[in-house]
Amino acid sequence: MAGAPAPPPPPPPPALGGSAPKPAKSVMQGRDALLGDIRKGMKLKKAETNDRSAPIVGGGVVSSASGSSGTVSSKGPSMSAPPIPGMGAPQLGDILAGGIPKLKHINNNASTKPSPSASAPPIPGAVPSVAAPPIPNAPLSPAPAVPSIPSSSAPPIPDIPSSAAPPIPIVPSSPAPPLPLSGASAPKVPQNRPHMPSVRPAHRSHQRKSSNISLPSVSAPPLPSASLPTHVSNPPQAPPPPPTPTIGLDSKNIKPTDNAVSPPSSEVPAGGLPFLAEINARRSERGAVEGVSSTKIQTENHKSPSQPPLPSSAPPIPTSHAPPLPPTAPPPPSLPNVTSAPKKATSAPAPPPPPLPAAMSSASTNSVKATPVPPTLAPPLPNTTSVPPNKASSMPAPPPPPPPPPGAFSTSSALSASSIPLAPLPPPPPPSVATSVPSAPPPPPTLTTNKPSASSKQSKISSSSSSSAVTPGGPLPFLAEIQKKRDDRFVVGGDTGYTTQDKQEDVIGSSKDDNVRPSPISPSINPPKQSSQNGMSFLDEIESKLHKQTSSNAFNAPPPHTDAMAPPLPPSAPPPPITSLPTPTASGDDHTNDKSETVLGMKKAKAPALPGHVPPPPVPPVLSDDSKNNVPAASLLHDVLPSSNLEKPPSPPVAAAPPLPTFSAPSLPQQSVSTSIPSPPPVAPTLSVRTETESISKNPTKSPPPPPSPSTMDTGTSNSPSKNLKQRLFSTGGSTLQHKHNTHTNQPDVDVGRYTIGGSNSIVGAKSGNERIVIDDSRFKWTNVSQMPKPRPFQNKTKLYPSGKGSSVPLDLTLFT
């Protein structure tokens, strides 16, 4: 529209008018400009929206990406393309406004290649930093595809380490030669890098390593510039190799670089592109291959020792392999550094890579990046120490370590040990990047820290566990053990203070039911075991009239106390739990895992001492109560069980001296400690005694029911315990079948006792059937009560839908006749 009006303006003015046409031209031109700007603005807005996401995340890295695209386009596409990025990239990158649409135009001119670079970069995330090194590769080989492919290839590269080691080294080889080749042109490389960081991160580094990328991008130009004069042709490669061998390998690596530098440089562009294509094709394998990366990395490592000679023989291929190995190996060098074995640097690095499969994958993904990173960070780090180079090499690892930390640790425990020293050192150079290698250890430490906290709760292992847990290759087994221990702890509730006896017993009982370990602690707390061993008897006691039968089933030692102590036990029983509570807390803090009976015995001894102090006052009343109720209980106890051990407990109450019962209490727990098997029975009765005694103490009226229970016990003893359960729960056992066949329903008669709850004073809601149930229907007056007919009996017919088999409420129909 704008072009057309320019020629026609002269003719239209006469029609419009003499004066009007000129303003119309200016107006039209202005309108056209406005329209064009608006239309462009629409496109620009779209472009901005798409590109803003990346630059906002990437900052300085964005400039590097833009530079890379610009440089690539300059060499690969016509020179016309580079000026556009060159002019637009820095300005627009700085502005982050108008330049972004221009970048899109560049991508359109560059055809699909820049677009893949844009699309690929989001996947690599960390690749942007890698992309910066590929830029030197791009100058070496004029091909726009190279930068775009490395960005895309960066993700596949990790796949390749797992899938095939050679391609990875080859990919780094391309970066390696460019670095030496760029040695002479080193200043140019840094120049390209600043531009590259401006653009590429925008597309590639979204969120993973924006800070990391920015750091390498910023540091890369100065470091290579400074280091390049020092090392001249080989400086960039020299720094990366030093990390792998620490010191001894520096000369070795430099030599292969010398041999490799000239030939591979020529081959790199051609060789690098096919490898990139292969890597792109292999991207799909990434997910499946990563799991096996450790084994394949080992194969690469095995190949690595042979590779150094190869560079001398075949500079292009060995160089490709050799450089990648140092960049990939640099993470392992941490091991050689720790192990102080330069000879093993080639082979030793091999084992470390498995722990850093993610690191390897990241390095491979950023294989180009790996080489640039060492030049950027490696030169300063070697100046500082040999270990920092390892950090530099590990720098590519940072993104992967967080996901692989478990795998990394499992793969090599030694690396974790080495990584521990690395952890403190790397953090200083780059905050996020430094954490990369240490990050792998730190995440486990975080896990371990959380776990040590659990372990500290469990035992004194916390201090040692923080270091040892981090280093071992298998933190997972420790986690499982810790979790198991945690369960025991939480069940025991060592951290929490016990407020009431009932709750304590419940918590302890649950813990014992769940885990065996608490049992040693529980001996100190005698009551808890009853729930586990005699949980059914305990329920039966609550629901039935036979409190003493359960005591006899549990063991007789406490039963005398139960009979004697029915009123007093609540006071006496509580003290043991109180004493036991401090012991469990101490035990939980000191040693929850220790099953030694001696410690428990000591704790028990302590516990009895406290009960000893408390019980003496209650003991005399207990003896007085015992005089009343001892006879039936004793008879039952002696009849039911051999009272070799039981006789001893009764003897202390006979002594009647308060101190004696106090001593007898400790003696009983000690015996239970000495004999783990017999100990539970006494403990269980103590619980039953406590519960019964507490209920009795709360309701003195309920104390009489236990004595009648023996008679019921005698009647019930004839039946098997299972039958007793049913009868105690649902009936008194007196119900019998009067008719085998019901004449009314023509069906076999049913024992109502199986479906009716037997009433007792101890059961709420169901009372013993000695009273007639009266329904208060005073509000309802039936005038024809006398005239209401009785229902006729149902006879000589079969009920299709028979009604209930009985009543859930105990009914004694004799009371209503």
From Swiss-Prot:
Basic and acidic residues bias: start-end ranges: 37-51, 502-516, 588-597
Low complexity biased stretches: 62-79, 336-348, 383-395, 408-422, 447-469, 518-534
Entry annotated with the keyword Lipid metabolism: no
Xref: PROSITE patterns: WH2
Subcellular location: Cytoplasm, Cytoskeleton
GO terms for biological process, alphabetical: actin cortical patch localization; bipolar cellular bud site selection; endocytosis; positive regulation of Arp2/3 complex-mediated actin nucleation; regulation of cytokinesis
Glycosylation sites: N109, N212, N337, N383, N784, N796
Post-translational modification: N-glycosylated.
Keyword Translocase: no
Described purpose of this protein according to its UniProt entry: Involved in cytoskeletal organization and cellular growth. May exert its effects on the cytoskeleton directly, or indirectly via proline-binding proteins (e.g. profilin) or proteins possessing SH3 domains.
Descriptive protein name: Verprolin
Organism of derivation: Saccharomyces cerevisiae (strain ATCC 204508 / S288c)
